[in-house]
Amino acid sequence: TYTGNTNRYNGVVESQDSYEVNVDSSRTIKEILVKVGDEVEEGQTLVTYDTSELEMQVKQAKLELEGIQNEIDSSKKKIATLTDELNRTTDEDDKFSLTTDIQSEENSIEENKLDLESKNLEISKYEDQIDASSVVSKKSGVVKEINENGTDRNGNNAAFMTILQAGEYR
């Protein structure tokens, strides 16, 4: 009878590669869609952000956009009225005053056009953030750790989630 030696080793077998998933700390997490031990596929949604505040900001910005457009329309009507008056008057003082008023309204329109452009960019920024309201897995693997508070045991910054890649082990 053969009573050979059997080699036994202590340790942990884990994937050679792991990657860290970070979240935007300035945003509120709505839902974590996975838990430790879950297998995840590349492209799978792991976390979703709460977008309700961003949606409210978009609505508010669109209302402000409408207000700015109304100011532009009002200035255009004033210019039309002032131009009619300018064409009818013969008094030089009135012509000067009306011309100044027209230029003032034209300047107001230009300022409001810049405000429109700025507000449209703001809306685009909010909409881009709403579109990017989830964090997806970049690789397939298994969720090793979820760290909701963003720090490790020693209080140092740590990844929100660690995923062990499927594949070779060590």
Where are these regions (language model features)?
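Surface-exposed patches in structured soluble domains
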Residues: 12, 31-33, 39-45, 136-170
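Long, amphipathic coiled-coil "stalk"/hairpin helices in large membrane-associated assemblies
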Residues: 6-60
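Residue-level signal for the solvent-exposed faces of long alpha-helical coiled-coils
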Residues: 28, 53, 57-60, 64-67, ...
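Short beta-strand-turn/beta-hairpin segments enriched in glycine/proline and small hydrophobics
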Residues: 4-29, 121-138, 162-165, 170
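Short charge-dense sequence patches
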Residues: 10-13, 93-97, 105-109, 133-139
